[in-house]
Amino acid sequence: MAAAALSRTLLPEARRRLWGFTRRLPLRRAAAQPLYFGGDRLRSTQAAPQVVLNVPETQVTCLENGLRVASENSGLSTCTVGLWIDAGSRYENEKNNGTAHFLEHMAFKGTKKRSQLDLELEIENMGAHLNAYTSREQTVYYAKAFSRDLPRAVEILADIIQNSTLGEAEIERERGVILREMQEVETNLQEVVFDYLHATAYQNTALGRTILGPTENIKSINRKDLVDYITTHYKGPRIVLAAAGGVCHNELLELAKFHFGDSLCSHKGAIPALPPCKFTGSEIRVRDDKMPLAHLAIAVEAVGWAHPDTICLMVANTLIGNWDRSFGGGMNLSSKLAQLTCHGNLCHSFQSFNTSYTDTGLWGLYMVCEQATVADMLHVVQNEWKRLCTDVTESEVARAKNLLKTNMLLQLDGSTPICEDIGRQMLCYNRRIPIPELEARIDAVDAETVRRVCTKYIHDKSPAIAALGPIERLPDFNQICSNMRWIRD
């Protein structure tokens, strides 16, 4: 539901590139702009409902070719503008898996109008940043610049997605870069575990493949593959031009018409359908007793962005929460699981997640444990899941709802996260959901709703499990599945 909010609780699933001042820098996802509240300060779960004030309207216009233009003008001196494209690794097959990510790498390697050096110098002289990332269902290119440079930023974005040269020399050079990136990803155990989790949960489907693709594909992708991907997927109805900050919607609309009105023709045939991705309860275990800690993810099948149960699962996700040893401990932690984990010294950290795609999702927990506590930690996690289905209280749900709303609003801080929120929501829902509407949907969730929805998705369901490290004491899959069942009143 809250596309921007959800992404903060998810584990890494996108690969980004940031260009600014001619060097690459990592960019973490931030969130959107400050929001103002009326009424007294929120002091407890019984506090009066808050009213969001001074939220600029999100204006949306659709061009004749299907491209949607959406913007929010907050009067800042800077702006973020970008292209959100309904195309990612899920639209690939086994042979071309990795093409979307490869294409993202090629975006800033020169166009028919600008060499790579010219592009870097122009961005540097503007004091701007160019960014791109690929996820399983979306590809994004965006720029952050001064508001006065909005026309130049839009023109550059249009140039790089429509006129990239895709030179053979650049392709070969980037091939090596991606292979080195794959080696770096393999050292990030959290990403490795989540790739394993997708591979086992969505076996032999597009969501089960990695975003980077297998090594053999990276070594064989050629210019024709990249051009074919652009021709198939970079079409008007599948693209959103989103902007936030100091932007005028009418100006943005005219820029969109000028740069995209004729070039991005609409589909002559049907838009390629999303390949169905069936969830399979199963596991992947990679035992390595030389590793100091065990890394484990367990998840059940959840729902897509627009499903009515999404909000309730977000609240349940907040109820489970997250914890790290650096947080300290005590019985006043908001998460019951955090209290038990801290008191029993069961793990180094855990993080709940609710990953939503168009028509499916993963709801679960990622944990890092000592070898001796893996079984105990998993047992406590499953007991907490059971408690969500049977014994969660109204006060706990009220606290989780307030925490969820607070986190969502705190994430909306700046033009870049607002722009990301607009772009994602336009692709997911074809509109930007107003914050008051989202708050009302969260407020409608009560303890009975949480118990009912969690029972629907957790009770007697076979989970997907990915485990890496010293996992000798991890219970076998049948035992884990049996612990997903309990006697209900």
Curated annotation (Swiss-Prot):
Catalysed reactions, as listed in the record: Release of N-terminal transit peptides from precursor proteins imported into the mitochondrion, typically with Arg in position P2
Needed co-factor(s): Zn(2+)
Stretch forming the transit peptide: 1-45
Keywords: Hydrolase, Metal-binding, Metalloprotease, Mitochondrion, Protease, Transit peptide, Zinc
Regulation: Binding to PMPCA is required for catalytic activity.
Subcellular location field: Mitochondrion matrix
GO cellular component: mitochondrial inner membrane; mitochondrial matrix; mitochondrion
Domain of life of the source: Eukaryota
GO biological process, any: protein processing involved in protein targeting to mitochondrion
Residue numbers marked as site, Required for the specific determination of the substrate cleavage site: E191, D195
GO molecular function: metal ion binding; metalloendopeptidase activity
Keyword Repeat: no
Summary of the function given for this chain in its UniProt record: Catalytic subunit of the essential mitochondrial processing protease (MPP), which cleaves the mitochondrial sequence off newly imported precursors proteins. Preferentially, cleaves after an arginine at position P2. Required for PINK1 turnover by coupling PINK1 mitochondrial import and cleavage, which results in subsequent PINK1 proteolysis.
Protein name: Mitochondrial-processing peptidase subunit beta
Species: Mus musculus (Mouse)
